[in-house]
């Protein structure tokens, strides 16, 4: 059964290496089923910065900054089959990678 839609897979992670490994495993699974694919497309990295005081009591000028970087990738799968969807659902991805699938 072939649908005429496309599936958009978005991957989020704090670690770039495991994000790229996950994207490559999805691309390999799609290429095995001989379906067209676009991506992985790197999306802008979201940087969240936190500034805290170093001292609990005095020294207001002494501060420390921390940041969290959220890396994103986008993969479009054109005309997916039901067998491809089953293989994507069974795919083992490393911990720390969030997957968002939309039609």
Swiss-Prot record:
Q: Mind listing the UniProt keywords for this protein, alphabetically?
A: Ribonucleoprotein, Ribosomal protein
Q: Name one Pfam family in it.
A: Ribosomal_S10
Instruction: Work out whether the entry's keyword set contains Ribosomal protein.
Output: yes
GO CC term (a single one)? ribosome
Top-level taxon of origin: Bacteria
Query: Sorted alphabetically, which Gene3D superfamilies does this protein's record hold?
Result: Ribosomal protein S10 domain (3.30.70.600)
What does the record list as GO biological process? Answer: translation
InterPro entries assigned:
Ribosomal_uS10, Ribosomal_uS10_dom, Ribosomal_uS10_dom_sf
Cite a single GO MF annotation: tRNA binding
* Function noted in UniProt: Involved in the binding of tRNA to the ribosomes.
Question: Would you identify the family this protein belongs to, as annotated?
Answer: Belongs to the universal ribosomal protein uS10 family.
Please give the NCBIfam families that the UniProt record associates with this protein.
PRK00596.1, rpsJ_bact
Q: How does it assemble?
A: Part of the 30S ribosomal subunit.
What is the protein named? Small ribosomal subunit protein uS10
The gene name on file is rpsJ
């Amino acid at each position: 059964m072939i649908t005429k839609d496309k599936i958009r897979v978005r991957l989020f992670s704090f670690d770039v290496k495991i994000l790229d490994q996950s994207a490559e495993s999805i691309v390999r699974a799609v290429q095995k089923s001989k379906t067209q694919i676009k991506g992985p497309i790197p999306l802008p990295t979201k940087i969240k910065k936190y500034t805290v005081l170093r001292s609990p009591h005095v020294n207001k000028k002494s501060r420390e900054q921390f940041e969290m970087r959220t890396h994103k990738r986008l993969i479009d799968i054109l005309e997916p089959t039901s067998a491809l969807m089953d293989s994507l659902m069974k795919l083992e991805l490393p911990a720390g990678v969030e997957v968002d699938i939309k039609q």
